[in-house]
């Protein structure tokens, strides 16, 4: 295998060429970290939040028509700082954010952080987002992890973007263009 050990964020994303782009990106980037100013300068949307820098990198790395699934803190959807607003705007304008899976706290062992999984395709603006709030009916944790049964309803419903008690459609036309939430 071709394994390169480096800090992806240290690369200026303007240097990414068409030949570097990928069809699929699946990621659970670190969040809560803070990057130094010299790293932030590699990105058009300057922020110290590691996960937001990775999200910019993923968008840039995708080919047109490329797909991404990325885990990120749920606060990304509502934070009002400049970087969060600008990144949501970029995501909604450059990609079709077709699905948001809202996971329960504790879905990832060792952290109680609430997360969402963003599923998007690069190359066309978002019109509608199917939002699914996963309710497993129990506390999650190391001895009670997320399992296939917990995910079964989501997997079935996402095939048709079914509307249920746990899922709904958000029309991007109703999104506040000042905050992009």
What are the residue ranges of the model-derived segments?
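Phosphate/diphosphate-binding loops
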Residues: 2
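A conserved structural/catalytic subdomain of Rossmann-like adenosyl-cofactor enzymes
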Residues: 5-181
